[in-house]
Amino acid sequence: MQELIKASTAADGVLLLTLNRPEKRNALNNATLQCLCELLEEAEHNAEVKAVVLTGNVQCFAAGADLTELVALDAVSLQLDIRPKLWQKIDAFSKPLITAVNGYALGAGFELVLHSDMVICGENARFALPEIGLGMLPGAGGTQRLARLVGQQLTMRWAMTGEMISAKQAEQHGICSQVVPTELTVEYAVQLAAKIAKQAPLAIRVIKQSIKNIHETTLSQGLKFERQNFVWLAATKDRNEGINAFFEKRKPVFRGE
């Protein structure tokens, strides 16, 4: 049986996941999403994994959902489909998830990118929401997540036309944090993940929670949540280690305690 996602250790504390359906342009069928959820669940409970990098291949990150699978589903079947729960599991992953995008990230592939915390793009990266061409709309958060990221105007345009978004445009509008040479995309993403992996795990977790919560809470609620975590972290061993290392002029060794 084909290995739908290849998993490997890319650096100390960094798990690299590579989508592996090249003959289907890494189309995200249910089996692939289920596999991704299982790998993220394992990473969640593995203290050795501090950050995850998710990538595809040079030509294609993921070209959307698998239409051969979706075409068999009617409205009733779609109501019972497991996909929404799989997307929720991906969203619930508490450790940093970085996507390294080369080539096409279309439809569900674009939505998978929008589920990640940071995005590194190769110069050949291209994004789009082409569902309108099928008489549909994005069904895994494409309208909601993208609008919160780039605003209503651009999301309306891109979702209603299916226009392609270049890597340069993606960086300009905050879809990715950096555009790099295509052949170095994964390397840059792993370097970023390795840098994060050296930080205090507890602090990284609540930073992610605090920032993700901005679309779900008011400013006052967000500030309260931030302050609560600030006080909580003050009681951790990692905080003491960070302060001691600063005064002793050495690099801290964080243990997630």
Task: Label every model-predicted segment.
Residues A27-N30, A63, A72, M160, ...:
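Phosphate-coordinating loops and pocket residues in cytosolic domains that bind phosphorylated ligands
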Residues A31, C35, I82, K89, ...:
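Charged catalytic carboxylate motif
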Residues L4, G56-K89, A105, G135, ...:
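Glycine- (often His-adjacent) and acidic-residue-rich active-site loop
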Residues M1-N57, Q88:
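Conserved CoA-thioester-binding segment of acyl-CoA-metabolizing enzymes
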